[in-house]
Amino acid sequence: MKRQLEAYCAHLRNERQVSEHTLLGYRRDLEKVIAYCKEHGIAEWQALQIQQLRQLIARLHHHGQSPRSLARLLSAVRGLYRYLNREGLCQHDPATGLSAPKGERRLPKVLDTDRALQLLDGGVDDDFIARRDQAILELFYSSGLRLSELTNLDLDHLDLAAGLVQVLGKGGKARVLPVGRKAREALQAWYRLRGIGNPRDRAVFITRQGNRISPQAVRLRVKAAGERELGQHLHPHMLRHSFASHVLESSQDLRAVQEMLGHADISTTQIYTHLDFQHLAAVYDSAHPRAKRSKGTDS
């Protein structure tokens, strides 16, 4: 079992090119399954059955593992069995039909509008790194891109004159998104320093060496901007969440937000309606004369 796990991890790293962070999580989850199998005398993946996997999930849940973590474990198991089936090493998948226990859906963290503007309106030095980072921040917030969508952008995916960007989302689905004026200005300023004809790579965002910027490097640059401008932890997906929340708050058009985010299912987008309600509730509590509570009262 361990040998086949190593082969699967090599497949993920070399052929699927998953990040080391994702690979570490998958390996950790699948090693839990191997430990359970060893404990119960199961020597090969083919011998693991749905009842036993269900028992493992129940045990982990009983010991405090979150529904989110258990869902990730099941995803890792399904991925492994897809690989084993494709390689002719197994003929079934014990995770078929299994789902993790339901948990409360956590609302995504967002910046309010003032904080978003504070982040983006700070002074920008006219140098390579500063202009690139500003363009990255503006494009995340302007168009709601995923991290992978941003780092995979090539120069011909952007039409600044038309204010459009074409991205390739999950499942290889392409979509075209608007790019706002501030983001276009930031990109034009970045292009002047990027040297479009010089670097080897056609990526929109590159390093000083002329190579496509990595997702990890973008995470670190966004984190640094959050600490510098806002004094808080910031990650790329928070800018995507903020984009979605602010567009929905202004437009009330859930379907349009779904299309811009590239969500296959509108139920995924509906999480932002809860954020919008939170905002409306906060406005009500601060503005309505009968909503304000006296200090010390809780009823």
From Swiss-Prot:
Domain Tyr recombinase: 106-285
Name of the featured protein: Tyrosine recombinase XerC
Active-site residues, as the UniProt record annotates them: 146, 170, 237, 240, 263, 272
InterPro entries the UniProt entry points to: CB, DNA_brk_join_enz, Integrase-like_cat_sf, Integrase_catalytic, Integrase_recombinase_N, Integrase_SAM-like_N, Recomb_XerC, Tyrosine_recombinase_XerC/XerD
One of the protein's GO biological processes: DNA transposition
Superkingdom of source: Bacteria
SUBUNIT field: Forms a cyclic heterotetrameric complex composed of two molecules of XerC and two molecules of XerD.
Its biological purpose: Site-specific tyrosine recombinase, which acts by catalyzing the cutting and rejoining of the recombining DNA molecules. The XerC-XerD complex is essential to convert dimers of the bacterial chromosome into monomers to permit their segregation at cell division. It also contributes to the segregational stability of plasmids.
Compartments in which it is found: Cytoplasm
PROSITE patterns to which the protein is assigned, alphabetical: CB, TYR_RECOMBINASE
Residue ranges constituting the Core-binding (CB) domain according to the UniProt record: 1-85
Organism, as annotated: Pseudomonas putida (strain ATCC 700007 / DSM 6899 / JCM 31910 / BCRC 17059 / LMG 24140 / F1)
Pfam families according to UniProt: Phage_int_SAM_1, Phage_integrase
Keywords, sorted A to Z: Cell cycle, Cell division, Chromosome partition, Cytoplasm, DNA integration, DNA recombination, DNA-binding
Gene that this sequence comes from: xerC
Molecular function terms from GO: DNA binding; tyrosine-based site-specific recombinase activity
Family listed: Belongs to the 'phage' integrase family. XerC subfamily.
Gene Ontology CC: cytoplasm
